[in-house]
């Protein structure tokens, strides 16, 4: 991962200038494991591009994996709070051997087969795109889901968000723009938790 938070780690990150963080293999651009917390502060004036690794990791959030490990605590995601800055987050994607198909992670949220996590976007200018074919823009990677997504608030918060899942050339959008990744449904119940959009500008494709 470009930055890796695990255990009870807490990071208040203030963006300045132009920055890029790229995860390798199962690493997220900024990886936020179970119990960890990332806050991108309201004092952020810079830009960040965060890209997930090639095993289907999130741009910001959970790790990716090449196998079904979603129930494993190592594939669980912590808390992500964004209050400022200009952020572009792209999910990574795992190419299925001997095919042209991919399993992608979320732009912001879980990686492939990831579980859990809270996402709050309270400010900033955010562009989030799910990993190839299956990742949500904000939410779950392929077969993944998050617990809570909150956009905006009741105290004048005004995030500006553009979010999309990946558009396949023949199959169209397979993951949600905001919500679950492809195959993130269990017993016909959408496995993503609460989604609340309270204020700000939100443009979606998915």
Please annotate each region the language model reported.
Residues 1-206:
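A composition-driven surface/loop motif
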């Amino acid at each position: 991962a470009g930055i890796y938070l695990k255990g009870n780690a807490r990071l208040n990150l203030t963006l300045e200038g132009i920055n890029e963080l790229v995860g390798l293999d199962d690493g997220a651009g900024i990886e936020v494991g179970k119990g960890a917390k990332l806050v991108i502060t309201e004092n952020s004036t810079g830009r960040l591009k965060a890209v997930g690794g090639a095993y289907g990791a999130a741009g910001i959030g959970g790790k990716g994996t090449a196998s079904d490990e979603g129930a494993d605590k190592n594939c669980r995601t912590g808390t992500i709070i964004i209050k400022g800055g200009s952020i572009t987050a792209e999910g990574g994607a795992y190419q299925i051997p001997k095919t042209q198909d991919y399993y992608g992670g979320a732009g912001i949220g879980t990686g492939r087969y990831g579980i859990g996590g809270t996402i709050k976007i309270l400010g900033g200018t955010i562009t989030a795109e799910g990993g190839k074919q299956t990742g949500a823009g904000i939410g779950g990677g392929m077969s993944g889901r998050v617990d809570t997504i909150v956009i905006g608030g009741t105290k004048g918060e005004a995030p500006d968000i553009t979010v999309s899942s990946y558009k396949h050339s023949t199959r169209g959008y397979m993951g949600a723009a905001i919500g679950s990744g492809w195959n993130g449904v269990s017993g016909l119940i959408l496995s993503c938790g609460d989604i609340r959009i309270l204020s700000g500008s939100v443009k979606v494709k998915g």
